[in-house]
Amino acid sequence: FRQESEDMMMFQGYDQQTVDFLWGIRFNNDRSWFQEHKEQYQTHLLAPTRALGEQLYDGLHAMLPHEPLILKVSRIYRDARRLHGQGPYKDHLWLCVRTGDQDWTGRPTFYFEIAPDYYSYGMGFWCAAPALMALYRQRIDADPKPLEKLVRRFDRQQTFRLTGPEYARSKGQVSDLLRPWYQKKSLSLQCEAPLDQRIFNPQLPQEILESFRELLPFYRYFTDLCAALSRQEGKDE
């Protein structure tokens, strides 16, 4: 289900006008500049991001045919209630492929983001519920081997790195291998790079999907964890 799209459009690559618009909105973040460059935004940033999202959605749907995935492309407009001195427009655009659950920020989600000076993609949680991360640590305590196997494989690759906020105090005794994972409040497996020639390449979706394939074992691990928490909460009601 492509929430944000109607007709399928193939990604042809971003272009220099994409980059120019992103820098422009960063330094000219006001309505008059945006209105003058709205067509540039729609043609050179929004349209290719949607096309990229559609191809990532199709690829992930093929890998995870039983998951109720949807595609979401972000709005460039900031929430007027939360400007906090910032301009009315974001200087970046992101998309995510996720399940349709209402509390999706607490579930594993695949994403791509582009900004004036970087692009990133990966999979992770942004606002994992404390109860979910508590269950995560309980599962590691009870049987660390499944995650250890995944982490050893993860540590051999060069594309993604583990990111996310950590607890200041130790949450328990765990092996050196798993300690960085055990201490996370939420986590993301992220690839971030300065803008380079890859973003202009029509093969970018295929390259990202091949990288996402390497994250599928983590996606399944955390999806199973979410399901276990749902069952546990259902019993408690």
Protein language model annotation of sequence segments:
Residues 4-24, 53, 145, 153, ...:
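Long, solvent-exposed, polar/charged low-complexity segments
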Residues 23-76:
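Active-site acidic/histidine clusters and adjacent loop/turn architecture
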Residues 29-36, 130-134, 201-202:
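Inter-helical turn/loop segments and adjacent helix faces that build the functional surface
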Residues 41, 45, 49, 133-136, ...:
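Amphipathic alpha-helical coiled-coil segments
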Residues 116-174:
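Compact, glycine/acidic-enriched structural inserts
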